[in-house]
Swiss-Prot record:
Residues 1-78 are annotated as: Disordered. GO terms for biological process: symbiont-mediated suppression of host innate immune response; symbiont-mediated suppression of host JAK-STAT cascade via inhibition of STAT1 activity; symbiont-mediated suppression of host JAK-STAT cascade via inhibition of STAT2 activity; symbiont-mediated suppression of host type I interferon-mediated signaling pathway. Keywords: Host-virus interaction, Inhibition of host innate immune response by virus, Inhibition of host interferon signaling pathway by virus, Inhibition of host STAT1 by virus, Inhibition of host STAT2 by virus, Interferon antiviral system evasion, Viral immunoevasion. Residues 10-20 have a biased composition (Basic and acidic residues). It comes from the Viruses. The keyword Cell inner membrane does not apply. Residues 25-34 have a biased composition (Low complexity). Belongs to the respirovirus protein C family. It holds the Pfam family Paramyxo_C. This is Protein C. Transmembrane segments: none annotated. It comes from Human parainfluenza 1 virus (strain C39) (HPIV-1).
Amino acid sequence: MPSFLRGILKPKERHHENKNHSQVSSDSLTSSYPTSPPKLEKTEAGSMVSSTTQKKTSHHAKPTITTKTEQSQRRPKIIDQVRRVESLGEQVSQKQRHMLDSLINKVYTGPLGEELVQTLYLRIWAMKETPESMKILQMREDIRDQYLRMKTERWLRTLIRGKKTKLRDFQKRYEEVHPYLMMERVEQIIMEEAWKLAAHIVQE
């Protein structure tokens, strides 16, 4: 039984119990409940107990069916919300989504991607050393380039999302992540380069 129905049904159950106790003889009452149920005679009191139990059972079943129906109606909406959150960048307008996918493809395959990883490498090399920067600089070149491309894609999909991303949307998102970027200088550099690449999409 759903937890929110317990508080509603308990007063009714107590009312039926008091009513039943008042209609049975005083000899059948004991100081404690028996381990086995007492045999009921074929009296009006016995028939009243039986009918009351049936009413209780039918009363319990109705809210349960209603609750399951409501949950089944809500379930598709909840699933839709989860799917939207799972993949950043999928909520953009069709035009922005096409431009974003095209840009990410160039980051991985075209000369734009080569220029990007070289710029990121030089900026990370010139910055003050941190554990993250040292880890990147010590990577093998092909692994490092792929790592920087993946980081850039993540920032692109983070910055370009919503029904239609505008400049003020980016500014708001930047303010949200600013404290994190102040502690992670490498992430700040990658985010800045990602923004340079995506600025034309936002300003369209």
